[in-house]
Amino acid sequence: MLGSVTDFLKPRLVDIEQLSPTHAKVTLEPLERGFGHTLGNALRRILLSSMPGCAVAEVEIDGVLHEYSSKEGVQEDILEILLNLKGIAVKLEGKDEVILSLTKSGAGPVTAGDIIHGDDVVIVNPEHVICHLTGANAEISMRLRVQRGRGYVPASARLHTDDEDRPIGRLLLDAAFSPVVRIAYNVEAARVEQRTDLDKLVIDMETNGTLDPEEAIRRAATILAEQLDAFVDLRDVSVPEKKEDKPEFDPILLRPVDDLELTVRSANCLKAEAIHYIGDLVQRTEVELLKTPNLGKKSLTEIKDVLASRGLSLGMRLENWPPASLADN
């Protein structure tokens, strides 16, 4: 009797209904009451957010400087073209990033099949329309950066400080790396012998064709199992506290006096007294500075005000100044 109360039913994969190459229904039963929603919601979230895939992440279109423009001879504006580029289903074999090119002229549609690529790239939906050329002399040329990633990554999340040097005309796209286009689940009633309070989980999902739906669910289940492994054997694992290396001096003290943007007269007076760094300056007193040739009360007031705006003052004591990095210089 005790075993029947504490033992959980183990679900089995009942059916995989392949509705199309990109659309499938997977049925799993029997599940203990409530486990249909528990597992269904977990798998749904993983399938939407954690499936790896490839997507167009950046594009450079000849004659286009920014996304809020249009191109002569092209029916769509640039924003619509960028939106269409996000719909290209692409797979990379053995690479994490490639640069592809597309050049098309003459009236008619421009499709994903017009993209020039090697054997290590597969365009799953070559019929996907990118834009339309409206005249015999119309032409469009672009370079596409395809990257491997996971989930959905907006363009703003991929901006870095070093992107200030990015050439004008390179447009970042919101990258939808996940191959899962749609995922829904339904929990139905199931029965085993006399028990009628069980769950049946039906997962209905579509992909963009770069990943088989059955394989997608298998990967999602593997990810979920790996994440739960840590809970199987809970132990008191103490994580050593990481000691942060605090700088010996405030970084502002290591900056040159020129960064204070003093007047030329004041700056020259300080340099004449070998005061090259802000740390050198804050250790001087008002009396010492007034003894500096050509440095009067007006210059002293200027220096005090500039230091105060940065939370500093004259007459500060700095132990072990100057640091070795400045002494070597």
Swiss-Prot record:
One of its GO terms (cellular component) is cytoplasm. Its EC number is 2.7.7.6. The keyword Transferase applies. CDD domains: RNAP_alpha_NTD (cd06928). It is an enzyme of class 2 (transferase). Keywords: DNA-directed RNA polymerase, Nucleotidyltransferase, Transcription, Transferase. One of its GO terms (biological process) is DNA-templated transcription. Signal peptide: none annotated. Residues 249-329 are annotated as: Alpha C-terminal domain (alpha-CTD). It comes from Tolumonas auensis (strain DSM 9187 / NBRC 110442 / TA 4). InterPro entries: DNA-dir_RNA_pol_insert, DNA-dir_RNA_pol_RpoA/D/Rpb3, DNA-dir_RpoA, RBP11-like, RNAP_asu_C, RNApol_insert_sf. SMART domains: RPOLD. It catalyses: RNA(n) + a ribonucleoside 5'-triphosphate = RNA(n+1) + diphosphate. The N-terminal domain is essential for RNAP assembly and basal transcription, whereas the C-terminal domain is involved in interaction with transcriptional regulators and with upstream promoter elements. The keyword Nucleotidyltransferase applies. Residues 1-235 are annotated as: Alpha N-terminal domain (alpha-NTD). Belongs to the RNA polymerase alpha chain family. This is DNA-directed RNA polymerase subunit alpha. GO terms for molecular function: DNA binding; DNA-directed RNA polymerase activity; protein dimerization activity. Homodimer. The RNAP catalytic core consists of 2 alpha, 1 beta, 1 beta' and 1 omega subunit. When a sigma factor is associated with the core the holoenzyme is formed, which can initiate transcription. DNA-dependent RNA polymerase catalyzes the transcription of DNA into RNA using the four ribonucleoside triphosphates as substrates.
